[in-house]
């Protein structure tokens, strides 16, 4: 079964079992709604969840979320989860509009410029206002491409390719 990151549990809050989480999802209103089921993993790379939990309630708070889980009413119930990752199963992913995609769908796609394959997407970095796509190139250093409409021209998931225009100086 495939799981996808939703948030990182960064701390507890108060004594009543609240968790402070940093959201990784574009759909926090869906992921943290009352009754939503989430899986807790020790690390992002783990393949088996530590526990499956149900959201009791959540609220946005200073750029993060305060989440309470069903059946966990004290700090003693949740303290063990600090530093762990919240994930959802693949079948819980939202349907996207045409032309939209999940980042995990582009990892491994061929990168094409002027009908020539220049590499494959290795990872996506999300540090600033734009994501940066890391392109693994044969016998060269990785290429860092900002996710801008003038650089990333087309993403074709069916063909497994991304059309790009590499600006001068980035090569």
From Swiss-Prot:
Q: Which GO terms describe its cellular component?
A: cytoplasm; ribosome
Task: Please give the function described in this protein's UniProt entry.
Answer: An accessory protein needed during the final step in the assembly of 30S ribosomal subunit, possibly for assembly of the head region. Essential for efficient processing of 16S rRNA. May be needed both before and after RbfA during the maturation of 16S rRNA. It has affinity for free ribosomal 30S subunits but not for 70S ribosomes.
What's the protein called, per UniProt?
Ribosome maturation factor RimM
Q: Which InterPro entries match?
A: PRC_barrel-like_sf, PRC_RimM, RimM, RimM_N, RimM_N_sf, Transl_B-barrel_sf
Which NCBIfam families does UniProt cross-reference here?
A: 16S_RimM
Which residues belong to any copy of the PRC barrel domain? 98-170
Q: Where in the cell is it found?
A: Cytoplasm
Q: Which UniProt keywords apply?
A: Chaperone, Cytoplasm, Ribosome biogenesis, rRNA processing
Keyword match Transit peptide? no
Q: Provide an example Pfam family for this protein.
A: RimM
Under the heading PANTHER family, the entry gives:
RIBOSOME MATURATION FACTOR RIMM
Task: Name any one GO molecular function.
Answer: ribosome binding
Name any Gene Ontology BP term: ribosomal small subunit biogenesis
Q: Does the keyword Metal-binding apply?
A: no
Q: Where does this chain mainly localize? A: cytoplasm
Q: Which gene encodes it?
A: rimM
Q: Which family does it belong to?
A: Belongs to the RimM family.
Q: How does it assemble?
A: Binds ribosomal protein uS19.
Domain writeup? The PRC barrel domain binds ribosomal protein uS19.
């Amino acid at each position: 079964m495939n799981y996808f990151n939703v948030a990182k549990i960064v701390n507890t809050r108060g004594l009543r079992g609240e968790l402070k989480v940093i959201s990784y999802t574009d759909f926090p209103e869906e992921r943290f709604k009352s009754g939503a089921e989430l899986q807790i993993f020790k690390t992002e790379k783990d393949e088996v969840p530590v526990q499956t939990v149900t959201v009791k309630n959540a609220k946005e708070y200073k750029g993060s979320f305060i989440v309470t889980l069903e059946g966990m009413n004290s700090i003693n119930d949740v303290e063990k989860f600090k530093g762990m990752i919240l994930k959802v199963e693949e079948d819980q992913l939202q349907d996207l509009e045409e032309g939209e995609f999940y980042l995990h769908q582009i990892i491994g796609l061929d990168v094409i410029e002027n009908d020539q394959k220049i590499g494959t997407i290795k990872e996506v970095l999300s540090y600033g206002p734009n994501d940066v796509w890391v392109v693994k190139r044969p016998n060269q250093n990785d290429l860092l491409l900002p996710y801008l409409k003038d650089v990333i021209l087309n993403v074709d998931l069916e063909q497994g390719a991304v059309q790009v225009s590499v600006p001068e100086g980035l090569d």
